[in-house]
Structure formats: structure tokens, C-alpha cells
Amino acid sequence: MKTPVSKLEKFTNDNARVDTAAVQPLPNSRKIYIQGSRADIQVPMREITQSDTATGRGAEKNPPIYVYDTSGPYTDPDTRIDIRHGLPPLREKWIDERGDTEILTGLSSSYSLKRLQDPALTKMRFNLMRPVRHARNGANVTQMHYARRGIITPEMEFIALRENQRRERVADLASNELLNRQHPGQSFGAIIQEWITPEFVRDEVACGRAIIPANINHPETEPMIIGRNFLVKINANIGNSALGSSIQDEVEKMTWAIRWGGDTVMDLSTGKNIHETREWIIRNSPVPIGTVPIYQALEKVDGKAEELTWEIFRDTLIEQAEQGVDYFTIHAGVRLPFIPMTAKRMTGIVSRGGSIMAKWCLAHHQESFLYTHFEDICEIMKAYDVSFSLGDGLRPGSIYDANDEAQFAELKTLGELTEIAWKHDVQVMIEGPGHVPMHLIRENMDLQLKYCHEAPFYTLGPLTTDIAPGYDHITSAIGAAMIGWYGTAMLCYVTPKEHLGLPDKDDVKDGIITYKIAAHAADLAKGHPGAQVRDNALSKARFEFRWNDQFNLSLDPDKAREFHDETLPQEGAKLAHFCSMCGPNFCSMKITQDVRDYAAQQGISETVALQEGMARKANEFIEKGGELYSKQ
């Protein structure tokens, strides 16, 4: 494996390297592929192998556990990764055989052409041009359009297999009653299916309750779905700023995010070379990529919001759609009459996109061009199958401002815009807050379902308190777990650097793991079928002191092993029936196992064994004189 580019070495398309750590399989795991109805539907999953349980009757087999895998080919040792060439175009044949797209002879965006013709960018540019597709004249190429016509696409079948996580392999094993046991959940009206079928995926997309972000110009992406009747997903934000980061850094963050479980990635770059950075990320990403196009549009007018125009924004949308961006955050709900409502707030308008559009509205004293040109935007979206992520530009930036008039006025508008997008068969999800105390979170979910007609909700946290800079991944994960339980379909992660600085690769991992916990906790609370299998497997391994299995089944095997080995580094300690927390004499699980072993030896129940043990101790106390404190 080649060494990553040094921070001191200038990035070029000759020396671009993948992060070595990102291509290592996770411990005791292997990539497997489940074939669908056709040979080119190969759905990736991670198989975690477990060791046997030692019993008095010999070894007891523990089955492998299958988990959702977002890492793409990076963790497949049989795949050669070279980020200079990008990933294989998995969906290219599916897109081509539908016959409703055409290959463009050139780029449609004037800005893209300008960047392509700039010789100064030659060494920085991703140098393998993928063919650029566009819908044939009059065609609509969205997954929603196909679903509404009753078509089950290969993407939909792929998703159904992926969501089921090969659960039938565990469910069919009668010996695995422990693994299959699951507490009933409370789904708050969600339609949770025992098994996900391609027909169910199609129907959820058709009615707008779920989206499949899958731009026809991002054939490298492995299909996934966002909707409250499916597994809760998480998004990772990356991106450079005017003050730091590079293309190499951002590609590393993307590969690191998907390794640990990021279902989608948003490139929020606001610094140099946004266009080139995004191309490298998309060509190497197996997960959907989202952006906020107004950020780049603002750079094109040197940061002067009042100089933005519809024409500049339109060209930016086309530029990014032809690169392969899968969903756009567009703050079309920031309307002129709503801006005065924010005057009474503690923290005003905290959304970057929201503040840009608010400034434009005030400078021109007009409705936002995002709002007035919304149907024009829909025409662009359906020509490439880009999904809307309707931005919450007026989200609360403090607990003080939670659930106020401005926030909910915008939410109603987003519901109106959703209906317009659906008339064009364009897929939509709705962005949500923000900073909200725990007792006000449920209202956000209820009103979103009401105003936005059950379109998927995508929330940033929410942060449940404002007093913990440096720990906002925790303050927000509390709210994320709650709102995920209530029905949010995707959670946008928050890193420990939130409000403080640009996250690095380690911060990305911390944010991902924290939000994987929140999303999984929500799946458990909803009663999502099979959600508890991994918990049960890890608990069984913990009780049986199978330390390596505990590490391998965890969300972060490396950290679990590192913490254990800080005090018990010897390899033999991974076979010990205790850890450094309680030591050998006070381990509750060891004591329970001793009781079970004694009961088995004596041919009695565990209850009787405990009673006999109590009686022996009572006799021992009396025989020693019945003194509360014995003299040495």
C-alpha cells in the first residue's frame, strides 16, 4: 500500500493516494455480496465472525452476524483501490438500459467549461472524464417517476436486500432464540415491515415517504434509501474552508466517514477549488453526495450575497448535477415576510444558506429567487434525478429560539414546496433543527409530518442544551436519538468541533460513531425487525467473556480493544473471566456463571443453587459466633 500524500507535499493527480487505514477490513470481518434477481445486483454486507462458546458439553457454535455496510469497495481486499481512477460505475448499465438518458457531447455549465479550460488546474483536476448524462428530451429520470409508473428498478431491489441485512440467516436458526428475541417497539405511526420487499420500496418512494438519492451522473453509488419506515440513516458533513484543508484531506474524510458508517456525505466546501474537490469526492464515493449549491454560487460573486442572480445559481445547479451530486440543500423556504420574525431571536439566523438568502431578500426587497424559480429548479432536478433536501434556513441556533414563529412559518412553506416538487416527480426530504430542548422535540416531528405530508425528515441533532462546546456531539446525539425514534429518517452528525472549528479525520470518526449510536437506539425503540440481533450477540459474548467477539461486534472495535488493553494488554487477558473494572473476585457475570455451573453439576435449578448457597453462608455465620465483625 502506498504512503498517503504528506501534508507538505502539494496535491496533484499524480500523487493522490487513498488513506491506508481506510482500506483495511475491520477485525474478524469480511465483505460479502448477496446476489439479487440478476447477476449485476450484488449487495454488500459485512459478515462478523464469532468464536465458539466453551461449555461443559463441548463447543457451542455462534453464528456470524451480518451488518449494514457503507464502506463500498474500500474494505474489500479483492478490489484494487486507486483514487486517481475512481470507483467502478456500478449503476451505469442499469441507467443505460432504461433508454431515457443521453450522453452529452460537452458540459452544459459555463463555469464547468471555464474550469476545464484553465491550464493552471491541470495537475489538480481528476483526470478521467466520465460521460455526462442528461434526460432525453421530455423524459423524467427520477426514481419517484419510475415508482409512480409501477416500475421496480434494480436500485429498489438492491435496497430491499440491503435493508434486510440477511436477517433470515439468523432467523432460520432455531438454536438462536437468544439472538432473535426483541422487545416490542413504539413506532409512532410508522409502517414498520417484518421484511422489506422491492414492492414496498417502490410504494414508499412513489408516495414520497422515502427517497433514493441517485443522480444518473453518480453511477458509482451503491443504492440506499431514506425514509422513516426503513433503518435510520446518518449523514457526515465534510468540506474545506477559506482557512484550511485540501483535496487530499477531504477525500480522506469521505473514506473515513463511510468506513465507520456514514450513509451519505455532504461536501460543504467554501474554500478554494470547490469544483475540483467535489469531483474527486464524487468519483470515489460509494454513498450519495449532497451539497449546498448557494455556497459555491456565493464564491462566484466574491462573497457578495446581494450580487447573486438566478442565472448564476442555475449554472451552479447544472454544474453540480453534471458532476453527480445526489441531493441539493436549497433554502427556498426563506421568504421575505419571515425575516422580521427573526429579529426577536437570541441568535438570529444561524444557517449559512439562510443568512445568504435573507441578505439577498433585504438588499432587493424581493422574494428569494429560489422561491420564485422553484419550478425551474424542479425541471433541472428531474433531468438528472437530483433529490431536494429543502433547507431549514430559519432553524433555531439556540435553545432560546427553539420552536418559534419563524421556524414553523418556514416549515409550512417547505410543505407547500414539497407538493410542487412532487408534481414533477422530484424526490424531496425536509431539513430540520437545530437547537431544541428535549420536551419540545416531539412537536417538531409531529408538525413536520403534518405540514410536509410525511416527506422524510433530515435533522441536525437537535442539540438539547447550549452549555457544552467541545461536547456537542453528545448534546446533539441525545436529541438525535429521540427525534429518530419519533420518525426522523436521517440524522446529520455533529462532531466535537461543532461551533469551534473545522473537523479533521478523527473528529469525523467521533461524530459518525456517536450518531451510529443514536440511529441504532432509535431503530431499537421503533422495534425495527432485527435491530436487536447485534445487541444480543454482543451481550452474549460479554457474558461468556469472549473478549475479541465483544470488540469485533462493537461499532468501534479499535477503541474497545484499546481501552481493554490499557490495563490488561496480555493476550491471555482476552480469555480471562474478568476485566480491570471489577477484577477477578467481584465480576457479577463471573459470579452468575459460577452459580450456573454449580447448578449444572448438582443437577438442580439456579434458584435452588442460590438458596443452598445462602443457607451455607448463614450456617457459616452462626458457626463463627454470630458476630457482626469478626476479630482477626
Swiss-Prot record:
Its cofactor is [4Fe-4S] cluster. [4Fe-4S] cluster binds at residues 579, 582, 587. The keyword Lyase applies. GO terms for molecular function: 4 iron, 4 sulfur cluster binding; carbon-carbon lyase activity; zinc ion binding. Zn(2+) binds at residues 435, 499. InterPro entries: ThiC, ThiC-associated_dom, ThiC/Bza_core_dom, ThiC/BzaA/B. It catalyses: 5-amino-1-(5-phospho-beta-D-ribosyl)imidazole + S-adenosyl-L-methionine = 4-amino-2-methyl-5-(phosphooxymethyl)pyrimidine + CO + 5'-deoxyadenosine + formate + L-methionine + 3 H(+). Pathway: Cofactor biosynthesis; thiamine diphosphate biosynthesis. Pfam families: ThiC-associated, ThiC_Rad_SAM. Its EC number is 4.1.99.17. Catalyzes the synthesis of the hydroxymethylpyrimidine phosphate (HMP-P) moiety of thiamine from aminoimidazole ribotide (AIR) in a radical S-adenosyl-L-methionine (SAM)-dependent reaction. NCBIfam families: PRK09284.1, PRK13352.1, thiC. Belongs to the ThiC family. This is Phosphomethylpyrimidine synthase. It comes from Nitrosomonas europaea (strain ATCC 19718 / CIP 103999 / KCTC 2705 / NBRC 14298).
